[in-house]
Swiss-Prot record:
PANTHER family: WD REPEAT-CONTAINING PROTEIN 55. Disruption phenotype: Death between 10 and 12 dpf. Thymus size is remarkably reduced and the pharyngeal arches are malformed. Eyes and swim bladder are also reduced. One of its GO terms (biological process) is rRNA processing. This is WD repeat-containing protein 55. The gene is wdr55. GO terms for cellular component: nucleolus. It comes from Danio rerio (Zebrafish). Its main location: nucleus. WD repeats lie at residues 33-72, 79-118, 122-160, 163-202, 205-244, 247-286, 290-329. SMART domains: WD40 (SM00320). The keyword rRNA processing applies. Belongs to the WD repeat WDR55 family. Residues 1-10 have a biased composition (Basic and acidic residues). Keywords: Nucleus, Repeat, rRNA processing, WD repeat. Nucleolar protein that acts as a modulator of rRNA synthesis. Plays a central role during organogenesis.
């Protein structure tokens, strides 16, 4: 049996070793685990902070870091009575906007974590989408297809239009902040002029829900994800009908986030996050996945180093996308191959806790083949391959 003195010496040695232990630096921040499914996430525009809203109506603010053990919850809010559908930071990062199934709009002070403004019954039905246009103007869309555009200086909406027959899934606007676009569960793209405060047109009805919308290719193309796994492409000022479309070989394309002018990340109900090049249309590879869990939303951080994702596994995961802007896509369509595995675009593409090697190829292996499997087979349903 060791003497008391020996025990004390060992204890002091362990404390000393812990004090001088070098913190582990990770490629990406650790996963954040919540107690409910997270519907929505947003990165702070100036700091390493992430906001999240869950199906219970709770909103959380986290600081994140690549130093192991340094992710911290800064505050939480339970002001929403039902599921939180969307969170967004103001451009200066001082305010956090949120919308909910409870039909309310909340604006919170980010530093204090306090509710500053509440607009109850902002819509007659649950709110599903939101876009911040500038420091005073924002837009919201609801479950029945109504679009509202708000002026915070007056605290009221100055546009209240219903032209969609189903929920508004996403909203975006052009750089001039003149033409506002909506995607809808009725399968149409909506076009609105917020300068003249009027509705312009709806596109032709596509096959299945339009789940997301983004403007790409220096403002010349509008890209929509869809519930049946097809990406639809419209020409700017040619919103009536698609100019191109291609199947992504995914169950759905539920959320899209542009990374460059040509490359976007797309999340699906199959749990996989794909990098996709637009014109030429190619699935470049996989960023990562939530194994077997539907992804609700993805978001890009301010310096395009990380992508975050939230899914039905109640996890927020971070992915390294810093090399994605350097990906090159060949215009030339090679002969289709039977091997339809995705190229892994991050080290964590394999980090799933299960055997994901069966579905992915390592980047080093891929480079050794000189890009022979350039995902050319994934554009087999595309109507065109170049701009």
């Amino acid at each position: 049996m060791a003497t008391p003195t020996e025990h004390e010496d060992l204890s002091e040695q362990e404390v000393t070793e812990d004090e001088f232990k070098t913190p582990k630096i990770r490629e990406t921040p650790e996963d954040i685990k919540l107690e409910a499914i997270v519907n929505t996430i947003a990165f702070h525009p100036k700091q390493d902070i992430l906001a999240a809203g869950d199906i219970d109506g709770d909103i959380y603010l986290f600081s994140y870091s690549c130093t192991e053990g340094e992710n911290k919850e800064l505050w939480s809010s339970g002001h929403h009575l039902k599921s939180c559908r969307k969170v967004l930071f103001s451009s200066d990062g001082q305010k956090l906007f949120s919308v909910s199934k409870d039909k309310a709009i909340h604006i919170m002070d980010v530093e204090a974590g306090k509710l500053e403004t509440r607009i109850p019954k902002a819509h007659k039905v649950p709110i599903n989408a939101m876009l911040l246009i500038d420091e005073n103007i924002f837009a919201t869309g609801d479950d029945e297809g109504t679009l509202k555009v708000w002026d915070m200086r007056k605290g009221t909406s100055f546009m209240d239009l219903k032209h969609h027959e189903d929920y508004i899934s996403d909203i975006t606007i052009d750089q001039a902040k003149r033409t506002l676009l909506t995607s809808s569960g009725d399968g149409t793209l909506g076009v609105f002029n917020i300068k003249r405060r009027r509705f312009e047109l709806l596109s032709e009805i596509q096959n299945g829900d339009l789940t997301s919308v983004s403007i790409m290719k220096r403002g010349r193309k509008v890209v929509c994800g869809s519930g049946e796994g097809t990406i639809y492409i419209f020409n700017w000022n040619g919103f009536g009908a698609t100019s191109d479309r291609f199947a992504v070989q995914a169950e759905s394309v539920d959320c899209i986030v542009p990374i460059t002018d040509s490359i976007l990340c797309a999340a699906s109900t199959d749990g996989v996050i794909r990098a996709i090049n637009i014109l030429p249309n190619r699935v470049v590879g996989s960023i990562g996945q939530h194994v077997g869990e539907a992804i609700e939303e993805i978001a890009r951080c301010r310096d395009t180093h990380f992508l975050a994702s939230c899914a039905h596994d109640e996890l927020i995961k971070f992915w390294d996308i810093s090399s994605l802007p350097d990906e090159k896509v060949n215009d030339y369509r090679r002969r289709k191959k039977k091997d339809r595995r995705l190229k892994a675009l991050s080290n964590k593409a394999f980090d799933t806790g299960q055997n994901f090697f069966a579905g992915l190829l390592d980047t080093t292996e891929e480079n050794g083949k000189e890009g022979e499997n350039d995902e050319d087979d994934d554009d087999e349903d595309s109507d065109s391959g170049s701009d």
